[in-house]
């Protein structure tokens, strides 16, 4: 990848077109072609060769720029990545982005993933590895109308629920297994709250830090919100994924990116202004109100700092947590029981303690 100019700190979302080889498309079947700029992966040199030289790195996100990505933007905006010898370009995602294709096609060096996809990749013999988990709790929520007698998730049984296609291989099988949800409840979610607002009997999916506010503003009411992570659905979220080849051959680069990203998150919670400016530049539809709401909910519900992350630092992961999630989802029929889920992650780059990341 060519050296990214100093201007990249302010212009770090790139668009273009990516055409992946047939072998990658076959390995990562189920995705679609994604707008991006093809780049080479920095695998030959893990550290700057001379003083002041930075290693170019591209990080792909899973959605449009928002508070849930704030720590990564903060590490760019405040120079934390540069302090770790990295010149980071953040490549914004969207609803049609297939992160596995981008990662395995070497269009990005790291990608923002989640536990279910990481284990599914191992099931499909795709060599990618989760190296950190920024969110201990998945922000996925189900949202219902007030005054409909819906007090908990079990009360949604029998109601129409607007969900995305991705839900069919993530949280929906869990809801079927634990709460008795059925196929006939599903409605197609097009990332627009309109259908939900028109049907008081319905519910819809969303992100804790986004859709509830949008519904409150558009619908004029406070929705009932259920965080799935507080109701038995326990994957890691907003993870950092890398190709196994990079993890094995260039661990120093992986460590520097993970450390800098985590430090960016601590910085973001202290003063989000630098990152928020960049987020708004790259996603003009994002507002100060939405960003403030997002940060508030991330902290209120302990998405990033809870469980092991309270002592081991943001990004923390444990073998026990991965095992618990795998067994829950295997019981729900999402994963084959003989999958070696331990190949989906490594603890080598995290769990260094909060003080380490605040230095």
Residue ranges and their predicted role:
Residues 320-359:
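Conserved C-terminal helix/tail region of periplasmic/extracytoplasmic solute-binding proteins
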Residues 80-84, 179-181, 218-220, 285-288, ...:
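Short helix-capping segments at alpha-helix termini
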Residues 1-27:
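N-terminal secretory signal peptides
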Residues 116, 191-195, 199-287:
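Pocket-lining segment of extracytoplasmic ligand-binding domains
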Residues 249-334:
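Secondary-structure end/capping motifs
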Residues 48-189, 193-198, 202-209, 226:
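Short, glycine-/small- and polar/acidic-enriched structural segments
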Residues 29-38:
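Bacterial lipoprotein signal-peptidase II cleavage site
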Residues 37-53:
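Post-signal peptide N-terminal segment of mature Sec-exported envelope proteins
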């Amino acid at each position: 990848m060519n050296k990214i100019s100093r201007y990249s700190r302010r212009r770090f979302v790139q668009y273009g077109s990516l055409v992946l080889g047939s072998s990658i498309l076959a390995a990562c079947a189920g995705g679609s072609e994604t707008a991006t700029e093809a780049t080479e992966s920095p695998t030959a040199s893990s550290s700057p060769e001379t003083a002041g030289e930075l290693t170019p790195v591209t990080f792909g996100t899973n959605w449009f720029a928002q508070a849930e990505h704030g720590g990564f933007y903060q590490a760019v905006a405040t120079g934390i990545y540069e302090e770790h010898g990295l010149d980071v370009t953040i490549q914004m995602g969207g609803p049609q982005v297939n992160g596995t294709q981008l990662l395995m096609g070497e269009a990005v060096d790291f990608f923002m993933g989640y536990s279910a996809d990481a284990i599914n990749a191992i099931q499909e013999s795709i060599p990618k590895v989760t190296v950190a988990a920024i969110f201990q709790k998945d922000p996925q929520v189900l949202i219902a109308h007030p005054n409909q007698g819906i007090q908990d998730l079990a009360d949604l049984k029998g109601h129409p629920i607007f969900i995305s296609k991705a839900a069919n291989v993530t949280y929906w099988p869990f809801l079927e297994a634990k709460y008795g949800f059925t196929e006939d409840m599903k409605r197609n979610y097009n990332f627009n709250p309109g259908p939900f607002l028109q049907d008081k009997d319905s519910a819809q999916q969303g992100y804790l830090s986004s859709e509830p506010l949008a519904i409150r503003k558009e619908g004029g009411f406070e929705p009932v919100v259920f965080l799935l992570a507080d109701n038995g659905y326990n994957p890691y979220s907003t993870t950092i994924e890398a190709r196994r080849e990079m993890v094995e051959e260039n661990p120093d680069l992986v460590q520097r990116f993970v450390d800098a990203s985590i430090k960016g998150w601590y910085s973001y919670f202290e003063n989000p202004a630098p990152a928020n400016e960049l987020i708004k530049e790259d996603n003009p539809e994002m507002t100060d109100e939405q960003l403030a709401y997002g940060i508030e909910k991330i902290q209120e519900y302990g998405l990033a700092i809870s469980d092991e992350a309270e002592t081991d630092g943001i990004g923390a992961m444990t073998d026990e947590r991965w095992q618990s999630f795998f067994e829950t989802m295997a019981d729900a029929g999402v994963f084959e029981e003989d999958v070696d889920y331990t190949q989906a992650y490594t603890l080598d780059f995290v769990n260094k303690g909060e003080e380490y990341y605040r230095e």
